Amino acid sequence: AYEISECLVGSEMCRRDRLKRNRTLSPEELRLLLTDAAPEEREYLHRAAREVARVHFGNGVFVRGLIEISNYCRNDCRYCGIRRSNRLAERYRLTPETVLACCEEGYRLGFRTFVLQSGEDPALNDELLTGLIREMRRRWPDCAITLSLGERTEASYRALFEAGANRYLLRHETITPDHYRWLHPVRMSLDHRIECLHTLKKIGYQTGTGIMVGSPGQTVDDLVRDLLFIREFEPQMIGIGPFIPHRDTPFGHEPAGSVERTLTLLSILRLMRPAALIPSTTALATLSGDGRMRGILAGANVVMPNLSPPDERSKYNLYDGKAAFGAEAAEGLAALERELNEIGRHISWSRGDYQE
């Protein structure tokens, strides 16, 4: 058992150090960390998470080339700008040839991981996707292929894995059933989403999950449950970003989530899962000009510049004001490198696979 004689039981210092040592805290202690932490305690937390990330990954930050292949979606999530019933969304779907051209450019720039992201588009069937993945694997055998395509059948996940995909991102968003029902349409089920996550792990994917911070109806207790679920599930990747409203959704007038709370959660998750691959998200950069670097300084170790065709980027509009150009874009790599250098980091061009 962790020896706590050097600090007062329940004190801030003890709480932080126990989290770093034991990789978990009690629900009540996590709650206090999220609600009562003074600015200096949050900074200590970020510093501890930063050091853990540095021990595991050095000063390198992995880059992934993000390609948003379709903004069609069969779902009607109440927070999402590409929800099915948003008739104002300008829809697009990239051809396999366009996706391959994006990968070609990304490979030339130095990317060795590609992330294919999409709404749950019924047109992206297994035949199309397996053909695309096989061709990517044939042309760039040294690259990792990450998918973020939503909920699919076990047979589909297996076919995509066997075609050559390595990783799969599927954020659960919230582990609280009532909150999940508030955010999502009736046809979507939290149980099914969690089942998908376990299926992905069973098949052999490096699996990622995560949460949206500050979504309408979310409580601190919901966040504590999310932290404990992630701790128990042990994902290889963790995606966490603030809720940002989209004007053409039922939640269009709700306030955005807190950058500070997102950074606190990011640091907690780094201490819980020291070797996890944790991106500093575009949503952080959208809400705060220095948000992406603040995410790195809170323990993140991945960034995902946008490789999508510039004409389509603004159409993959999950929320208002999305940062998709400048240092957020693949063509802004020099700016990204400068920003990282200013905080003592640099781009790592390796595949960046998960390693315990």
Stretches with model-predicted labels:
Residues 67-69, 120-122, 149-153, 174-176, ...:
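Active-site-proximal loop/turn and secondary-structure-junction residues that shape catalytic pockets
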Residues 49, 77, 116, 170, ...:
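Conserved, mostly hydrophobic/aromatic
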Residues 57-58, 62-97:
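Canonical Radical SAM [4Fe-4S] cluster-binding loop centered on the CxxxCxxC motif
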Residues 1-14:
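Short, small-residue-biased leader/transition segments that mark boundaries at the very start
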Residues 11-40, 107, 231-356:
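Auxiliary Fe-S-binding modules of radical SAM enzymes
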Residues 153-160, 216-229, 285-297:
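Catalytic cores of alpha/beta
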Residues 84-99, 106-127, 132-197, 206-213, ...:
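Core AdoMet radical
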Residues 65, 103, 130-134, 157, ...:
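Generic structural signal for well-ordered alpha-helices
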